[in-house]
């Protein structure tokens, strides 16, 4: 088939090593009609996308999130791919090579997802043309979009950053792709939504296909496309006022717990639940929610209310734990809301109890909260103590960098109502936001030059006015001179800063502020993530504070991308990226016992940080490894007491000042990069793999196969008359039979690692048998720190590595609502051991059977159970109950790290 781009498009530059790697494998990725590439900021994903479009040789439709990105595609094609013939073609031919209007398509037509939606709906499309300046309007009434696509011969679709689209955009895109089924899809993103829900991820991969190739941050640092950098965390404890609110909440919970344990009416109501004595009649229903069932039984045990002993058995526990606030929360959720009709109690009593809990702050939106509520979590996320953290970080960085400091602080909100506090120290600025952060820096930072850049607000130091005006006139000689409105204190004295009214000139002012920031007239720039967190670049940034509450992988990586660009003016640039976390944990052992938690529950802020860091691949604090996750930041560890938090912060301040060490660690780690690859490693607690009946069964299968072969040889010798060999063969068989009888004792002494390694090989065998993995690759399994087993795929494509780790993780996942289970031992309903059939094998029984059969030599004979019929449903409920009671036993983890050939 003729390639329509021959002679018109040809890449003018030189492909970097990591780009060559992706392009070498691109043809293989295209086998299923989809290629999905993730590339860290700075990897040149746009030119990769253009090259892939060129290779398809067919007219293409490019879809982008915003107009500015839509235009960047066209500019990049003209600047990096247009040949002389293409330039002549554009001038003389009727059909253009490039277009941004689907009504008049070119060979390559670049539009936004919003335009696709409007064109599909046949309605007026109104979009901001970029950075809030003006709009672009097209009326698609009467326009036949699908007919135009067919007429233009468009057979390739390039999806740029196809994630977190508005729901109506998603629907339009899905409808379009359902109609145009034979399209070649090229999906490109810097930030795949790895942290999305399973349903969201399934929707995303159904559209884009599984990830085929990934260009990682370490590759870009090695090639000099990104600068060395390190992540740091600054912890704070709640302020006095916040601490008092937390203490009051916990005291309310403790008082309510004592009250409820002495409340005879609650005991009478609990005793009325018919399930306590009717196990057979209520088994299936109660097992739908094992947590609630456990809470009810634990409360009844504490109040000496009798119940069937079969309940603890089905939960897989020999003894119920003592009652605590945790279990009271489960019980009350059912009693008051989820299972209220099952209790014989006066409705007035129930309503009065609801009122008591609500007044104590222990219920929100029909949810019972004894450990922490949403209000407390939100307060901690927006803790005023983080303002003090920003000051301390700025002080550390200014001390270390001096005039070279170029710090960016990103927040969620402007908080323009605090402008009246600028220059008035008597006014409080304790709320997180652009203006409060700026004013705090102005008040406390003697000699710091701060500034603000937002969609509706620009604040500059008076010392930068002249430079700002010069930049404005340099960019646009016809522009009017900006107006500076000085901030003044109560006495009318100027405080050294002015507001510059934006008045529709945001694009111009953004460019000018960026320039004077890079020149040092502003050292600390404060802005919102919406304007500066994505699409805005200043290569001079060498320190970034993420004062945003956003925890998603996508936005977190977009914001980090601002700081790690190389700076041609500073070849030795090293960036620090700062994260803010507020910690609040019950410090007393007696508090934890009463609450029913073995270890302190960490704050939602901390879990947000964990989610962020799961999507970040970087060098560890000790410089020995490149991996993702919080584990590489070795100083961040328990106990998170106030004293230890202060110690962590002190260590962090010292580390952050030594940028040369960070550069050296990256250099050292990247020297070892040659011959290495990024491993997608799945890790599981070694306690999961105690040798047992299942493993003995597996070895038994292997021995029986050997015995069968020996029996065939023995019978063959008898038939052929080789009598001299018969006694030897007979003795061999007797020896192996005796060995088989005693193998149980032998195997029980073998290490759990043997079983884990066998399972890992079985998973790979199943994936190869089903045709999901076709390249030459091998499984590597090893024990880590004496606590974890890890496994990863060496060799193979990025997609295969990810698929292998996903499959193993799903096999060992807690039982919830999987379609198929593997069950071993016990009776028909209640097995001794369960494994989940991974999603990729669960779509049909024949696939699930492949998975089971390929695992037999490694884990023995397991029954395959379909959970969507009545019998399978019972097994699923029992398995789920067992998984809930033993949920800490199947601890799992996932990380990406650099592995060498000898590892």
Annotate the PLM regions:
Residues 1-38:
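Conserved pre-motif I regulatory segment
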Residues 68-96, 100-101, 205-208:
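Conserved helix-turn-beta segment of the N-terminal RecA-like "Helicase ATP-binding" lobe
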């Amino acid at each position: 088939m003729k390639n329509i781009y021959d002679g018109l498009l040809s890449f003018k530059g030189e492909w970097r090593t990591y780009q060559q790697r992706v392009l070498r494998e691109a043809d293989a990725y295209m086998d299923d009609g989809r290629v999905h590439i993730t590339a860290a900021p700075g990897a040149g994903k746009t030119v990769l996308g253009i090259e892939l479009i060129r290779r398809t040789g067919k007219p293409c439709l490019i879809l982008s999130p915003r107009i500015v990105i839509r235009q960047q595609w066209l500019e990049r094609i003209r600047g990096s791919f247009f040949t002389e013939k293409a330039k002549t073609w554009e001038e003389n031919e009727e059909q253009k090579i490039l277009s941004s209007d689907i009504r008049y398509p070119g060979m390559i037509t670049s539009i936004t997802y919003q335009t696709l939606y409007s064109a599909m709906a046949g309605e007026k499309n109104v979009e901001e043309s970029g950075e809030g300046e003006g709009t672009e309007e097209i009326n698609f009434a009467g326009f036949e979009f699908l007919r135009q696509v067919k007429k233009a011969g468009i057979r390739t679709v390039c999806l740029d950053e196809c994630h977190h689209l508005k729901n109506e955009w998603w629907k339009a895109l899905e409808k379009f792709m359902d109609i145009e089924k034979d399209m070649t899809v090229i999906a490109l993103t810097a930030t795949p939504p790895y942290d999305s829900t399973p349903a969201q991820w399934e929707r995303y991969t159904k559209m884009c296909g599984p990830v085929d190739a990934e260009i990682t941050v370490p590759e870009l640092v090695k090639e000099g496309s990104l600068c060395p950098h390190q992540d740091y965390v600054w912890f704070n404890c709640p302020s006095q006022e916040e601490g008092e609110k937390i203490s009051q909440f916990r005291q309310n919970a403790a008082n309510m717990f004592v009250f409820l344990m002495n409340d005879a009416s609650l005991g009478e109501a609990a005793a009325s639940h018919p399930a306590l004595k009717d196990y057979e009649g209520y088994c299936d229903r109660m097992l739908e929610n094992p947590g609630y069932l456990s809470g009810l039984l634990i409360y009844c045990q504490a109040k000496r209310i009798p119940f069937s002993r079969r309940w603890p058995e089905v939960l897989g526990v020999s003894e119920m734990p003592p009652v605590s606030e945790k279990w009271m929360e489960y019980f009350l959720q059912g009693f008051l809301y989820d299972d209220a009709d099952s209790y014989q109690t006066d409705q007035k009593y129930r309503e009065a109890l609801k009122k008591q809990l609500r007044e104590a702050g222990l219920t929100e939106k029909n949810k019972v909260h004894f450990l922490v509520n949403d209000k407390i979590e939100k307060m901690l996320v927006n803790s005023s103590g983080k303002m003090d953290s920003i000051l301390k970080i700025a002080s550390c960085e200014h001390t270390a960098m001096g005039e070279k400091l170029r710090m960016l602080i990103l927040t969620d909100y402007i908080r323009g109502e605090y402008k009246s506090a600028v220059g008035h120290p008597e006014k409080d600025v304790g709320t997180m936001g652009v203006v409060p952060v700026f004013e705090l820096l102005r008040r406390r930072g003697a000699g710091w030059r701060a500034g603000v850049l937002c969609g509706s607000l620009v604040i500059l130091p008076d010392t930068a006015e002249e430079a700002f005006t010069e930049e404005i006139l340099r960019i646009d000689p016809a522009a009017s001179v900006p107006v500076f409105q000085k901030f003044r204190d109560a006495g009318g004295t100027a405080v050294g800063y002015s507001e510059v009214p934006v008045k529709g000139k945001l694009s111009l002012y953004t460019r000018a502020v960026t320039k004077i920031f890079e020149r040092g007239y502003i050292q600390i720039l404060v802005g919102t993530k919406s304007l500066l967190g994505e699409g805005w670049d200043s290569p001079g940034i060498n320190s970034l504070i993420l004062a945003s509450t956003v925890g998603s992988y996508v936005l977190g990586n977009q914001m980090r991308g601002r700081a790690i660009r190389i700076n041609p003016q500073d070849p030795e640039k090293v960036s620090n990226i700062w994260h803010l976390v507020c910690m609040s944990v019950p410090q007393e052992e007696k508090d934890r016992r009463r609450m029913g938690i073995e270890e302190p529950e960490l704050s939602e802020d901390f879990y947000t940080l964990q989610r962020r860091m799961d999507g970040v691949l970087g060098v560890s604090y000790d410089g020995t490894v490149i991996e993702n996750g919080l584990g590489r930041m070795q100083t961040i560890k328990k106990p998170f007491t106030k004293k230890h938090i202060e110690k962590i912060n002190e260590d962090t301040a010292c580390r952050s000042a030594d940028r040369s060490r960070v550069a050296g660690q990256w250099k050292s780690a990247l020297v070892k990069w040659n011959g290495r690859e990024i491993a997608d490693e799945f890790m599981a607690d070694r306690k999961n793999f105690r040798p047992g009946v299942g493993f003995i069964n597996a070895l038994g299968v292997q021995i029986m196969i050997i015995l069968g072969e020996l029996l065939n040889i023995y019978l063959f010798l008898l038939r052929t008359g080789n009598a001299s060999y018969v006694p030897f063969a007979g003795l061999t068989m007797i020896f192996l039979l005796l060995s088989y009888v005693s193998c149980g004792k032998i195997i029980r002494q073998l290490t759990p690692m043997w079983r884990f390694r066998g399972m890992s090989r079985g998973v790979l065998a199943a994936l190869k048998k089903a045709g999901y993995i076709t390249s030459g690759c091998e499984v590597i399994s090893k024990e880590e720190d004496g606590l974890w087993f890890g496994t990863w795929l060496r060799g193979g494509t990025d997609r295969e590595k990810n698929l292998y780790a996903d499959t193993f993780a799903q096999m060992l996942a807690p039982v919830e609502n999987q379609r198929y289970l593997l069950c071993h031992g016990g009776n028909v309903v209640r097995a001794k051991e369960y494994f989940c059939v991974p999603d990729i094998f669960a779509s049909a029984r024949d696939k699930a059977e492949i998975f089971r059969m390929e695992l037999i030599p490694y884990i023995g004979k397991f029954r395959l159970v379909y959970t969507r019929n009545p019998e399978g449903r019972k097994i699923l409920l029992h398995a789920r109950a067992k998984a809930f009671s033993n949920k800490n036993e199947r601890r799992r983890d996932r990380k990406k790290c650099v592995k060498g050939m000898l590892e």
